[in-house]
């Protein structure tokens, strides 16, 4: 009789460990998926930028330094691997694009340019998608990181080497 009780407890513990492990794996996959959604939108924005810069360059001749910074950020972003690196570069690029948009107010002929208007609208839409994706990613990471820290899943997370993820911080 005692052997059956011990065996029952062991089976319940094994099932609990498997359940917690699977829950952690599912959460990790959700985090990876949420990151890929941000990555897609960031790539879309980086793909729009060369056309935007070419459109603006002819009008904003005094902004050469800004355009060089954008080119440098694009190169750095292509080589960035971690979430924190990409978040930092994204923040710098967002600030630079806001500067260009603000300066464009001083160029009425640029604002009247159809290509500029269309690209500006596409960039704004992409920025909104990035913002939404960032929020979803951070929510998903928060849930995942919470699972890594609460008992008893923290024990399973430690046993199977699950690591906390960084939030995508915007400035």
Q: What role is predicted for each listed range?
A:
Residues 1-171:
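A helix-centric hydrophobic-segment signal that preferentially recognizes long
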